Amino acid sequence: NYENLDKIKKAVGKEHLVLDLSCRYRSEPGKTSGYYIVTDRWQKYTDEMVTPELLDELSRYCVEFLVHAVDVEGKANGIEKPLAKLLGDWGKIPITYAGGVHSFEDLKELADLGCNHLNVTIGSALDIFGGTMPYQKVLQEISDLNKKL
């Protein structure tokens, strides 16, 4: 709802806004296949397909996107590679990718597919949350990947 985006932007300023975009892949007859923004606990598809044009439009209201790949979120079973590529190819403002990271290979793939434009959030895969990825090693890996920029 662009009217509400305008209101919040005027109230707090674009420089204080991060838009949270929950994205789910949709492929069904009569619809263009792609990642769509979903609402209501990730159950309802909107008509908004994630495209460079949509990201351009929404970036008028914020300084960063937090993008949830909801089909893989919380599963620690791999990232949504096509979504990471789409976001990285666009890369005009900071984007934090969330969803599916479960290995150091995923971090490397996000850096490559995301053209080094993506930040990452890791949840259940971290050892501090019961996962297998040691927190300190993740910090080091991300630092090493950033040095390659």
Language-model regions: role of each:
Residues 5-11, 108-149:
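C-terminal helical cap(s) of enzyme catalytic domains, especially alpha/beta-barrels
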Residues 76-77, 130:
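RNA substrate-recognition surfaces in RNA-acting enzymes
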Residues 1-8, 82-120:
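Catalytic cores of alpha/beta
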Residues 19, 65, 87, 110, ...:
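Conserved, mostly hydrophobic/aromatic
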Residues 18-22, 68, 96-99, 121-123:
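A cross-family glycoside hydrolase active-site/sugar-binding cleft signature
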Residues 47-52, 77-86, 135-139:
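Charged helix-capping and loop-helix junction motifs
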Residues 1-73:
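Conserved anion-binding
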